[in-house]
Every structure is written in C-alpha cells, then in structure tokens.
Amino acid sequence: MDLAGLLKSQFLCHLVFCYVFIASGLIINTVQLFTLLLWPINKQLFRKINCRLSYCISSQLVMLLEWWSGTECTIFTDPRAYPKYGKENAIVVLNHKFEIDFLCGWSLSERFGLLGGSKVLAKKELAYVPIIGWMWYFTEMVFCSRKWEQDRKTVATSLQHLRDYPEKYFFLIHCEGTRFTEKKHEISMQVARAKGLPRLKHHPLPRTKGFAITVRSLRNVVSAVYDCTLNFRNNENPTLLGVLNGKKYHADLYVRRIPLEDIPEDDDRCSAWLHKLYQEKDAFQEEYYRTGTFPETPMVPPRRPWTLVNWLFWASLVLYPFFQFLVSMIRSGSSLTLASFILVFFVASMGVRWMIGVTEIDKGSAYGNSDSKQKQND
C-alpha cells in the first residue's frame, strides 16, 4: 500500500469527513427549514434554492467516490443519444444490485450537471434518515410505503407536483423494488414461474405498477427513459466503506435512451413492455459477465471540479472553528470536558456508521423476501 492509500485508510481522516458531512449537513438542513417560508410566496424560487442546497450535501458523497477513491466510470451508449444527456428530463431505470449503485447514479447525474435536481422513488423510511433524508424531503423526492393501495394515490400526487419543476432532472427508479440478494431472487423467480414469465438470471422481476404510474404521471414532461445497467470490472462488489477507505473501483454503465413515446400508455401494455426490458437487461448483464464489456461505444464523461470545490468550502467553514474549540479545550486541561468531547465524537461517528449501514446489502430491507408480497405489489 502506498502512502496515499495508507492515509486514506486512517480512521482520523474518516472522522474529518464525518464531521464535515454532519456539521455542514445540519447547517444546510436548517437553512432548508427556513426556506419553507418561501413556499407560499414563490414556490419556484423555493425549489431553485433547495436544488442548490441539496447539491451541497449530495456532492460531498460524489466527491468521495470520484476524487477520494478515484473511482472511474465508463458509459457505453449510442453516440447519437449522448449529446441529449443532461439536456432533458429523463426517467432512469437502474439495476439495484450494489451497495453504491445509488452513488453511481448520483455520479452520472453530476457529470451531466443534474445532481442538484435529481429525483428518486424511495422507500418512506429513508425520509427520516438525518441529513440525506431531510434533504430529500425539501427537494420533493417521491416516497412510497410499498403498499399499493396507499402508494397509488400518494405517489401519483407527488409525481404530479414535479410536472412544473423548474430544473432539469433525472428521476431514478429501481424497478426491482429492493436490492438483489440470492434469496430475494429465488422467491422472485417462483413468482415468475407462477405467472408464466421467462426466468431472469441477474435480476428479480420488476415491480411494474410503480414504473407505469411514473411514466403516466410524467408523460409530456419527461423526454425519455434511460435504461441503465451497472456492473464493475474484475467482478468487484464495491461498498460505501470501501469508498471511504479510498478503494478505487471501475464502473461500467450501459445506457440506452428510449423515447417516452415508444412506451405504451396503457398500464397492462406498459407492464409487458417493462418485463421485456428486463429480459433485455438480463441478456446485457450476461454478455458483460461473458465478455467483460457492454455493447455500444465506450465514453468517459469528464468529472467536474465542483464537488471538490464544494467540499473544500464546507471543510474550511466548519473545521476552522472546530479546531479553535479543540485547542481551547486542550488548554483548559479539564478531563471532564475532554471526555465529553470524545463521547460526542464517538456518537457522531456511530451515527454516520448507521447511515452507511442503510446501504449495506446484508442489512437491507426484508422487502422481496415474501412471494405473497411480491404478487400483491407487482
């Protein structure tokens, strides 16, 4: 391990990142709270401000991926479609297999200049996660309870609110509804056999209702669906802790642009279309495992400096008073004060570890572990 790699693996560096993220995140969340005063006066101004405040938080995690760990991303796509990326609203359908697939989705949004306004269809519990969940609330993320009778109304209403959103955005949706595990996959394939659907080797069955209502609600606002299939070279299974430790990965992302007018408007036909899409995604994934590459032309969208600039700004803003406070405590010589400081720092680091745990596969939700629930929510 070289000197840089040794430095990146040090717990002290991780504490610095944790402190900057927590301190800046809570400051930004507080500012977002006060922006609620703008909502009844000027809703679009509220949205533009929160779009930029959201960037200040989410870009810190993208900075860790792109600049700290040095993870690279190669996009395989049609060169004729590439110029449209970042210039239009799009629904992004991304496979949900890796612990950092959401971070790769953010990186894609950042490289095309849409990170601040990016949206996602997320489980309702995430709205209560400090900093990121609260940030999502203020940027009008669409939350679902995974109970269709409730979601058919609440999700549709939330999506309708995005029809006049003033910023360009990618709307990310994991149609599988849950992260891939062997157990969930086997249960899903039991449902596939019961429904007479082809077996998928690398994906669970997609949940079609959420996709259909998203397409229906955003039609004539969103220009296309971006079918994205993610994999990592050398058969690696990256983790957020690995990124924090500075481990470098190389992501390969196959992106197909599908005009929204090519997707059926009827819900049943739209569901059949999505099942066919996932059969194609499965074939692309199988080809990747066999050949180590995806179809189409490989391209590397350049990383932008703004994630690093943003982190340096917040680091200088919150670290300087912190070190002043630390020096004053050391000079005071009070054992009780120092012990209290260490306790607070320990609790903060455990809090960040808990937030990281939300992304870990072995600590993921039980959603998808019951075939009866899958049949109900498909």
Swiss-Prot record:
InterPro entries assigned to the protein according to its UniProt record, in alphabetical order: Acyltransf_C, Plipid/glycerol_acylTrfase
Keywords in alphabetical order: Acyltransferase, Endoplasmic reticulum, Lipid biosynthesis, Lipid metabolism, Membrane, Phospholipid biosynthesis, Phospholipid metabolism, Transferase, Transmembrane, Transmembrane helix
Motif (HXXXXD motif): 96-101
GO molecular function ontology, one term from the record: 1-acylglycerol-3-phosphate O-acyltransferase activity
Protein's GO biological process: CDP-diacylglycerol biosynthetic process
Enzyme class, spelled out: transferase
TM helices/strands, residue ranges: 11-31, 125-145, 307-327, 338-358
Pathway it works in: Phospholipid metabolism; CDP-diacylglycerol biosynthesis; CDP-diacylglycerol from sn-glycerol 3-phosphate: step 2/3
Compartments it resides in: Endoplasmic reticulum membrane
CDD domains associated with the record: LPLAT_LCLAT1-like
Membrane association type: Multi-pass membrane protein
Known function: Converts 1-acyl-sn-glycerol-3-phosphate (lysophosphatidic acid or LPA) into 1,2-diacyl-sn-glycerol-3-phosphate (phosphatidic acid or PA) by incorporating an acyl moiety at the sn-2 position of the glycerol backbone. Exhibits high acyl-CoA specificity for polyunsaturated fatty acyl-CoA, especially docosahexaenoyl-CoA (22:6-CoA, DHA-CoA).
PANTHER family noted in UniProt: 1-ACYL-SN-GLYCEROL-3-PHOSPHATE ACYLTRANSFERASE DELTA, 1-ACYLGLYCEROL-3-PHOSPHATE ACYLTRANSFERASE-RELATED
Family, per entry: Belongs to the 1-acyl-sn-glycerol-3-phosphate acyltransferase family.
Protein name: 1-acyl-sn-glycerol-3-phosphate acyltransferase delta
Protein species of origin: Macaca fascicularis (Crab-eating macaque)
